[in-house]
Amino acid sequence: EVKGAEFGNVKHPLFPLHPNCRCAVISVIDKTADEKSDKTDDNSLDKVYNEDRDIKSIKKYMSSIDINTASHEDLISLGSLVNENFDIGGKLGNKSELKKVFSNFREMGGTISSDTWFNRSNSAVKKQLTEAFSYYPKGWADYLTDNNKKLFAGKSQRGFFNGDLVNAAQTYYLTGAAPGDGVSIYGNGIRKTTAFHEIGHMVDSFNPNLIRIEKEFIKSRTQGEKVTKLSKLFPNSNYKAREVTLKDNFISPYIGKEYRNATEVLSMGLESIFEPQNGHVKRYLGNGKYESAKITDDKEYLNLIIGIILKG
């Protein structure tokens, strides 16, 4: 949620030798083994060559995309190339493998320096954020230092991001903080998805082009659709009357939630890739039953998020 969103080796076994053995061991050439070994090596080399060639081709296409003018279609195309060649959809939740693949295209693994954390940050929330940043592009953590911003990790029942250093009730600035000094990410310190989700809002806040692209994506998917209250889609939920969405056929209606200067597109996508769990609730079927979905059920959306991870 966004708060304040106005902003093949061959082995030949040896028999055991006793200490006084005077036997000689001679080499025996196994021609079939050599043939098998050569074949394996050739295939391995071909695989490495082809993968390297694919990486170079994707990098070339990636460098041709200017994020300042890029469309959502550009990033979907980029994401599609990586997904088809490296099966991102088959690696959901495997954070180390995801990081390994994305490292082929940009520097991954962000860190937050001790002096970037705002004082009195909650240790449990801080730990979760530290882990999430370590799997994300390095540039995302660098947004803070590059803009001379502090990060406060706060504890609250419901996770949210705020573009300033504020208390959990968002009624005042934290002691010692002034407008523009930093940003806040809140969570309960237990829910694993929160950190991966809220960092997405932080990234959007530092990169207006991403918000533009995400809004273009929503618009392309919801032409002619009228907003719907989330509380109507999910009875007995805690959604407020003012929380409305363009639900489309997204894996979660929450993806189309309306903000003036923010979206849930990147945040929901990141959560769906890095910490997918059992998927998202897509719709309420009645009688206490729900339909769920994963990001692999919406390839266009998946490819968009991959593209943003690479270029955002």
Segments from the language model and where they lie:
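Activation/maturation switch segments at domain boundaries
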Residues: 1-111, 291-312
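A short, highly charged nucleic-acid-interacting micro-segment common to nuclease
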Residues: 111-132
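Histidine-centered active-site/metal-ligand motif
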Residues: 18, 197, 201, 264
